[in-house]
From Swiss-Prot:
One of its GO terms (cellular component) is cytoplasm. Belongs to the galactose-1-phosphate uridylyltransferase type 2 family. Its EC number is 2.7.7.12. Pathway: Carbohydrate metabolism; galactose metabolism. It catalyses: alpha-D-galactose 1-phosphate + UDP-alpha-D-glucose = alpha-D-glucose 1-phosphate + UDP-alpha-D-galactose. This is Galactose-1-phosphate uridylyltransferase. The gene is galT. It is an enzyme of class 2 (transferase).
């Protein structure tokens, strides 16, 4: 056993630029935050984040912070800020190291973001993840449990909290070092790497609740809305040049087919191989005037044109030609509608990579028009699969990684009981699906039911992606896809 405060101070010195001479100063600053009573109580913890959690709990007892998770997070971030260098130092270290080894610069910043608990490693470990097979290859499924559900008391407190427009959104630069409040996340330990993309100033940070390895965000330093343009393709390819081993992609810039934040232009990236990346090409061709670019249609439930070549300027120019062609392309025979009046329905979800010295750009065609039959969107998960996924299909899911809601953890356990003919409290909206599982697997046992239900979830998610695909994976749909490609001009 060691004394809590002393142990935490020792860990700060071990993980920062502070020295032993600073120990008294650090102790006093921490006491000011958590209170003096029982600060030297015994602890058997040696992990920095676990020690931080004990100090936060002590602060609650001492009346220095409220008991709501949001209040404790604000204090926790402030305590972890002791091991986090100031932004200018973080940026200098990153770019100094980057000049010698980009890989090491990325690794160092990633490790800092985990060490200071900005990336919620413990929370992320709660996610349920598994892989299911499909005709398109393996599909990755996750049930997202990392973000804690809101406490009713916190919801009530947030309603009473003073409204604020600062920061404007959670992707703004003003989040760096922000204290946080009952209705806004703590960011005292948050750091952003400054960078240039062309003539624009951008930032690079990690996602606190990562969905995959080294999940990061690239954000415009100005609060400007999402827009897909030729500049988007240029910037994505620049990113994969600057960050070796990372992909970079953008959500679409229209509702229904876009991401959850359309108000602030940003991209996502990371060090992860998604199922779509390794999917085969159904066909290979070249576009006129672009002999240095190989193109093809990807064997994937969504409609993807893959461009590949060593000259990124050619890829940027061709991608913009495809985007503009798609923006104005309609096909009544396939229920593909570019405009309703002056309202545009067509955009793309672009993803960039660099592999073996070649640049790759996947252009995923998107259509957000609605009808009386499909009020949520013709190319949105249809009603019969919304019991599994009803939210927008964004960048990450387009690539074959399902991010399913936390409710499914309990709900799928009840489905398993139903399939086994046991007492259950299964939600009614799963019944047709669960009946189909029972009918196709009469031999199900307690040993096999979990895997059977997981595979059924995977098949349903594939259907979700097929619903979001503009050109369906049948002969008629693929012929129509080639008509669009040929309208641009192929050799």
């Amino acid at each position: 056993m060691t004394a809590l405060l002393d142990t935490f101070v020792s860990k700060i010195i071990e993980n920062s630029d502070y020295a032993e001479l600073d120990a008294t100063y650090l102790s006093n600053r921490i006491l000011a935050l958590v209170g003096e009573d029982n600060a030297q109580q015994d602890t058997n913890q040696s992990n920095l984040i676990a020690l931080k959690d004990e100090l936060v709990d002590l602060a609650v007892v001492n009346g220095k912070v409220g008991d709501l998770a949001e209040e404790k997070d604000c204090l926790g971030a402030e305590l972890m800020n002791f091991i986090t260098p100031i932004p200018s130092q973080v940026n200098k270290a990153f770019w100094d190291t980057n000049a010698k080894s980009p890989q090491k610069a990325i690794k160092d910043f990633y490790e800092l973001s985990k060490r200071n608990n900005y990336i919620k490693v413990t929370a992320i470990a709660k996610n349920i993840a598994f892989t299911t097979s499909s005709v398109y290859g393996d599909i990755d499924i996750t049930i997202n449990l990392s973000k804690p559900e809101k406490d009713p008391k916190a919801i009530a407190a947030a309603k009473l909290a003073k409204t604020s427009n600062y920061p404007k959104c959670q992707l703004c630069m003003e989040n760096e070092g922000y204290q946080g409040r009952i209705n806004y996340p703590a960011r005292a330990n948050h750091r952003i790497i400054r960078m240039n993309l062309g003539d624009e100033k951008w930032g690079f940070q990690y996602s606190p609740y990562a969905y995959f390895n080294e999940h990061c965000i690239f954000l415009n330093t100005e609060h400007v809305p999402m827009v897909i343009s030729q500049n988007t393709f240029r910037q994505l390819l620049d990113i994969v040049d600057i960050f070796p081993g990372y992909f970079a992609g953008s959500n679409s810039d229209l509702p229904i087919v876009g991401g959850s934040i359309l108000s602030h232009n940003h991209y996502q990236g990371g060090r992860h191989i998604f199922p779509m990346e390794i999917a085969e090409l159904d066909s290979v061709f070249r576009f006129k005037d672009f002999p240095d670019v190989t193109a093809g249609i990807v064997k994937w439930p969504m409609s993807v044109i893959r461009l590949r070549g060593a000259n990124k300027y050619s890829l940027v120019e061709l991608a913009e030609i495809i985007r503009l062609a798609w923006r104005n392309y309609s096909d009544d025979t396939m229920n593909i509608l570019a405009f309703t009046g002056d309202t545009p329905h067509h955009t793309v979800t672009p993803i960039a990579r660099k592999r073996d010295g070649q640049f790759e750009l996947d252009i995923v065609l998107r259509d957000n028009h609605t009808t009386a039959e499909y009020p949520d969107g013709v190319y949105h998960p249809h009603i019969d699969v919304q019991h599994i996924k009803k939210e927008n299909i964004g960048l990450i899911e387009v690539m074959g990684l399902a991010i399913l809601p936390p409710r499914l953890k309990k709900e799928l356990a009840e489905v398993e009981k139903y399939v086994l003919n046991q007492y259950n409290e299964m939600a009614d909206y799963h019944k047709d699906w669960a009946d189909a599982i029972k009918a196709s697997h009469p031999e199900t046992s307690s040993e096999t039911v979990s895997e059977i239900v997981k595979q059924a979830v995977g098949r349903t998610f594939v259907r979700v992606l097929e619903d979001a695909g503009v050109y369906k994976r049948n002969r008629q749909g693929q012929a129509a896809f080639m008509r669009f490609v040929e309208s641009i001009g192929v050799k």
